[in-house]
Amino acid sequence: MQSTDLKRLLIPSLLGLAIVTGSAQAAAPLRPPQGYYAPVDKFKSGDNSEGCDAMPAPYTGALQFRSKYEGSDKARATLNVQSEQAFRDTTADITKIERGTSKRVMQFMRDGRPEQLDCTLAWLSAWAQADALMSKDFNHTGKSMRKWALGSMASAYLRLKFSDSHPLATHQEQAQKIEAWFSKMADQVVSDWDNLPLDKTNNHSYWAAWSVMATAVATNRRDLFDWAVKEYKVGANQVDADGFLPNELKRQQRALAYHNYALPPLAMIASFAQVNGVDLRQENHEALKRLGERVLAGVKDPDTFEKKNGKQQDMTDLKVDSKFAWLEPYCSLYTCAPETLERKHKMQPFKTFRLGGDLTKVYDPAHEKGS
């Protein structure tokens, strides 16, 4: 048989194989990184749990909040103490459910007390029932709170949903109600943040994409997954050849802090994409790696940022270990230098409610130091 004849025979079958393989991958349920499958550490009994705090009232009002940078110029870098306090007061219940969900899930995954799980699900179910955080009446700070809250709650929930201990098996009705609410909120977050002009696309868009990625996996929605990946690529392509983000450089004395703040959502999205067969590490010539290295170098020598934008950098935020929680997913994607790993181990465990709790437990359990 001539090779051309053989090719004619093979091409349709190879095409068929490619189509089958592609559709099988597309049909595979979305999943989180392996650490989310961890079982509950131990199931304790007795009444040593801390009880269930009073539930924060479901927030169903307009998402119109004052910005902590109110009155600041375009750089949005000068804190307004009065408006920050007003913001904290009006968003207190939202922050309480974010922090409370993260805390209770961590406690339950450690102690396995049914009361901890019941408390978490009761809070989330009540907010879902009330259709909280879904107002179409919002300003920029309001839509920012919506995506932060969704990311916090959905990413903590993932540990319950995927744990090999299957804690949600006997709570299916509540789980469905909560997931339907997350799903609806993610649709609104996409609407809030989709297709912004590039000069308006910054860390907020990356955090929005993270909340949508966490929800995509919690609800197995490929359309949400694809949107989060799309937004990641926009962000990665904003990183310049030297690892700077031009829109974050505009933040003057807080430029380095905001570069660091842009990293957690990007690293988490790349990590989640990776386990679902989408490798984002190479996007824009390893943009994520370049950004991480630029920030770590900047922490060591902030002058690199001062030379870039002419402003001495405010290092306050960069003295907080949890602000470097992005190192967990980042060092699972790239081979981190020994010096970086040493820094990571000194700062562990990384607990941050906006990423769903204890990331060290998820990504580097060998270095988990307990709670």
Curated annotation (Swiss-Prot):
Q: Which GO terms describe its cellular component?
A: periplasmic space
Transmembrane stretches, start-end: none
Q: Does the keyword Lipid biosynthesis apply?
A: no
UniProt subcellular location: Periplasm
Q: What is its EC number?
A: 4.2.2.3
- Binding-site residues, substrate: S67, K68, H140, T141, Y258
Cleaved signal peptide residues = 1-26
Q: Where does the protein principally reside?
A: periplasm
- Plastid as a keyword of this entry, yes or no, is no
Among the GO biological process terms of this entry, one is: alginic acid catabolic process
Recite the UniProt keywords alphabetically.
Answer: Lyase, Periplasm, Signal
MF-aspect GO terms: poly(beta-D-mannuronate) lyase activity
Any Pfam family hit: Alginate_lyase
Looking up NCBIfam families in the UniProt record yields: PRK00325.1-2, PRK00325.1-3
Family label:
Belongs to the polysaccharide lyase 5 family.
State its role: Catalyzes the depolymerization of alginate by cleaving the beta-1,4 glycosidic bond between two adjacent sugar residues via a beta-elimination mechanism. May serve to degrade mislocalized alginate that is trapped in the periplasmic space.
Tell me what this protein is called.
Alginate lyase
Q: Which organism is it from?
A: Pseudomonas fluorescens (strain ATCC BAA-477 / NRRL B-23932 / Pf-5)
